[in-house]
Amino acid sequence: MRIVIDTNVLISGVFFGGFPRKILSSVVTGEMTACATAEIVNEYEAVVQEMIDRKQGHISKNILTPLITALEIIEPVTQVDICRDPDDNKFLSCAKDSRSLYIVSGDKDLLVIEKFENIQILTAKEFCEKYLSL
């Protein structure tokens, strides 16, 4: 199964646990494939660094290494312009170009779309309840 993980799900999984962490663990263990572009990976790294700085450095940026290593990095070719927050179009483009079936997000600007072509947009809880054994 191929998915795209929105940055807020990644942050929740890394720093807070719960359903987002179950998804990240499933990617790291190879149970599913998470796809990203270089732009998305850069955003992951920048936001994690911001969180580390806020927590005064008690967590190493290396916490992302297992996930980044497990990601399938793709080169986007499709331009998508349907999200009310233009910065989120990169997740739709990545999902389309990687032939992912799901975007896992907590972002209302993405969740309101619900489905883009054959790609479902689900919360981490919805995704876990439907596709991961809890």
PLM feature segments, named:
Residues 1-18:
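Metal-dependent nucleic-acid phosphoesterase active-site entry motif
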Residues 5, 21-49:
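PIN/NYN-family metal-dependent endoribonuclease catalytic core
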Residues 6-7, 36-37, 106-107, 123:
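A secondary-structure boundary/capping signal
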Residues 11-13, 53, 78-84:
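Short, flexible loop segments at the rims of nucleotide/cofactor-binding pockets, characterized by
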Residues 18, 35, 58, 82-89:
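Residues at secondary-structure transition points
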Residues 31-34, 99-101, 119:
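Short active-site oxyanion
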Residues 69-102, 108:
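Active-site neighborhoods of divalent-metal-dependent phosphate/nucleic-acid chemistry enzymes
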Residues 98, 108-134:
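Acidic, PIN/NYN-like endoribonuclease modules and their adjacent C-terminal/linker elements
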